[in-house]
């Protein structure tokens, strides 16, 4: 225990340690451990109320000044030799703490001690924030940011000492002005306010408050991700959607009404159309016959008017000049010819009537021999007509060739003028005569519609659970991973966007553990091939976790194909592309 001014008696390089753990020395000691003392001391920054029983060994000059434990007598800058003490020491009186902590790499080390001082104190420039200091304090010159500044009562002068452009000594007080001085340098009986520094970016945006309000795009908070989906559409689009819904509803009602109707009415309409066509043909033939009769009557009427004019002129002609008038002779000659034709027709009709009356009188029935004979006569008649038609056709062909040769020789036209008529006739022959279409209620389904519906159903149905699958995946670095992975939607489908995932007969998907290499959880494009590839072959650019049809695919989509590579016919192996080699980078 040292008392007063002690210029110690410890030997150089050693310190006598008492059994209690305190060094004994007297006077102003160099290099000797001292016990706590009370009195006037300057700087007890590293002093401890119960110093540990340590021995310090020093060599050379200045051993006690920089290597001994601080005493609480009249000491100048005593430092703790080992680690910095973390307990608080109670000091009284006038204290100036400018101690240098040991084991520090920087000139200004910042220990974590705190002192409780009373009276007029100039608090340490190297200690932490003083706690509950009373009296006249020069507060916290260069305090460390370990703790915040506690409430100081009394007259406090000073603040955190900050450097120019940057804080050399960080402080809990942020409201500073000038060279580290507190903006409220003279605070009588009030607590020094502590505030956290507000970090603002470009435009004055506070990141501490705006970061909580930003919508999380990673999907960690579902309420923020749902806010984008629930955003109201513009009224124009809403009106269009409502009109579309109304139109679809009306079309569904029409479909229901049509589906409840029977096809018997349609078949009846078809029969009525056939009957009306027959009546129309009869009316057309009758109209044509009447047209011919009208034309004939016109000609006959004109001829009769001519004959009447001739008769009138013949009557007015004198009898001496009648030898030059031949019109009456021509008229009577034509009239006799007409009578002759009419008499022949009448004779034929009379014979038919006589035969009919004879058959009615004899009561004879038609035998099968008569029917066969009648059919033979009809057949012979058709053969004769066919022979005549053939001869006429040959004559027409000869005339056609002669006409074409005539045009070629005299007109210089080597083209066939009958080609247009021939193509028109061919179109007319190829056109179906019966214009009735297929029934709208056919039982045979449409293959394209069934395939499209099956594809949509497969894409929309949820996954039933992870199923193990085996396959080969070619990732972006073409690392092959052969093993079992967990696929999300069964065999033959895939999750796009996985690094190293394949759309084939199984492979590791994103987030699943696979036995092999070339499969990671990093989303990127993947060139995938495998057995039963049903999703996409080529480079896929899409987000992970969505269906196979929702991504933007750069490649050839092969739905429901079972080939190797880009897909083809069922169970048909094809050679891989030349550029997709395993060792290529």
UniProtKB/Swiss-Prot annotation:
PANTHER family xref list: NUCLEOPORIN P58/P45 NUCLEOPORIN-LIKE PROTEIN 1, NUCLEOPORIN P58_P45
Modified residues (Phosphothreonine): 317
Function: Component of the nuclear pore complex, a complex required for the trafficking across the nuclear membrane.
Family statement: Belongs to the NUP58 family.
Protein name per Swiss-Prot or TrEMBL: Nucleoporin p58/p45
Alphabetical keyword list: Coiled coil, Glycoprotein, Membrane, mRNA transport, Nuclear pore complex, Nucleus, Phosphoprotein, Protein transport, Repeat, Translocation, Transport
Region spans: 14 X 2 AA repeats of F-G: 7-565
Modification note: O-glycosylated.
Coiled coil residues, start to end: 242-262, 300-367
Domain notes: Contains FG repeats. FG repeats are interaction sites for karyopherins (importins, exportins) and form probably an affinity gradient, guiding the transport proteins unidirectionally with their cargo through the NPC. FG repeat regions are highly flexible and lack ordered secondary structure. The overall conservation of FG repeats regarding exact sequence, spacing, and repeat unit length is limited.
An example molecular function term from Gene Ontology annotations: protein-containing complex binding
Region Disordered, annotated ranges: 194-232, 563-585
A cellular-component GO term for this protein: nuclear envelope
Bilayer topology term: Peripheral membrane protein
GO biological process: mRNA transport; nucleocytoplasmic transport; protein transport; regulation of protein import into nucleus
Highest taxon in the source lineage: Eukaryota
Compartment(s): Nucleus, Nuclear pore complex; Nucleus membrane
Tissue: Expressed in liver.
Skewed-composition ranges (Basic and acidic residues): 211-232
């Amino acid at each position: 225990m040292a008392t007063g001014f002690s210029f110690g008696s410890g030997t150089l390089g050693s310190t006598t340690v008492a059994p209690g753990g305190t060094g004994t020395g007297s006077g102003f000691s160099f290099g000797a451990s001292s016990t706590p003392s009370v009195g006037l001391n300057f700087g007890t920054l590293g002093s401890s109320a119960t110093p540990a029983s340590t021995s310090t060994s020093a060599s050379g000059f200045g051993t006690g000044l920089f290597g001994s434990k601080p005493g609480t007598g009249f000491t100048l800058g005593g430092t703790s030799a080992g680690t910095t003490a973390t307990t608080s020491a109670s000091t009284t009186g006038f204290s100036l703490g400018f101690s240098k902590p040991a084991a520090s790499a920087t000139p200004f080390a910042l220990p974590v001690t705190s002192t409780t001082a009373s009276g007029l104190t100039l608090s340490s420039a190297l200690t932490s924030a003083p706690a509950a200091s009373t009296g006249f304090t020069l507060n916290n010159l260069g305090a460390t940011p370990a703790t915040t500044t506690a409430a100081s009562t009394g007259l406090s002068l000073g603040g955190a000492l900050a450097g120019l452009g940057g804080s050399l000594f960080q402080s809990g007080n942020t409201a500073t002005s000038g060279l580290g001085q507190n903006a409220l340098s003279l605070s009588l009986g009030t607590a020094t306010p502590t505030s956290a520094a507000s970090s603002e970016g470009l435009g004055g945006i506070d990141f501490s408050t705006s970061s909580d309000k930003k919508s999380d795009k990673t999907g960690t908070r579902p309420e923020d991700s749902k806010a984008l989906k629930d955003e109201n559409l513009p009224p124009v689009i809403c009106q269009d959607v409502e009109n579309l819904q109304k139109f679809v509803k009306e079309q569904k009602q029409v479909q229901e009404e049509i589906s409840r109707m029977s096809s018997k009415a349609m078949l009846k309409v078809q029969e009525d159309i056939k009957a009306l066509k027959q009546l129309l043909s009869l009316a057309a033939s009758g109209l044509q016959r009447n047209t011919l009769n009208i034309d004939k009557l016109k000609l006959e009427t004109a001829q009769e008017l001519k004959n009447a004019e001739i008769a009138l002129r013949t009557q007015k002609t004198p009898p001496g000049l009648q030898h030059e008038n031949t019109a009456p002779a021509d008229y009577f000659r034509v009239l006799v010819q007409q009578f002759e034709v009419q008499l022949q027709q009448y004779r034929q009709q009379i014979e038919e009537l006589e035969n009919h009356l004879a058959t009615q009188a004899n009561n004879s029935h038609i035998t099968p021999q008569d029917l066969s004979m009648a059919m033979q006569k009809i057949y012979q008649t058709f053969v004769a007509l066919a022979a005549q038609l053939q001869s006429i056709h040959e004559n027409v062909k000869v005339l056609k060739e002669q006409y074409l040769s005539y045009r070629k020789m005299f007109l210089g036209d080597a083209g066939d003028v009958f080609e247009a008529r021939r193509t028109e006739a061919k179109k007319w022959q190829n056109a179906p005569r019966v214009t009735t279409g297929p029934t709208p209620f056919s039982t045979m389904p449409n293959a394209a519609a069934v395939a499209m519906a099956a594809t949509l159903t497969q894409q929309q149905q949820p996954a039933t659970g992870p199923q193990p699958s085996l396959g080969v995946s070619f990732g972006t670095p073409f690392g092959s991973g052969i093993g079992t992975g967990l696929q999300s939607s069964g065999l033959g489908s895939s999750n796009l966007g996985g690094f190293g995932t394949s759309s084939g007969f199984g492979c590791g998907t994103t987030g699943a553990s696979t036995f092999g290499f070339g499969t990671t959880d990093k989303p990127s494009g993947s060139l995938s091939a495998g057995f039963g590839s049903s999703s996409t072959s080529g480079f896929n650019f899409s987000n992970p976790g969505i269906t196979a049809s929702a991504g933007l695919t750069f490649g050839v989509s092969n739905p429901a194909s079972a080939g190797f590579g880009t897909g083809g016919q069922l169970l048909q192996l094809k050679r891989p592309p030349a550029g997709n080699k395993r060792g290529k980078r």
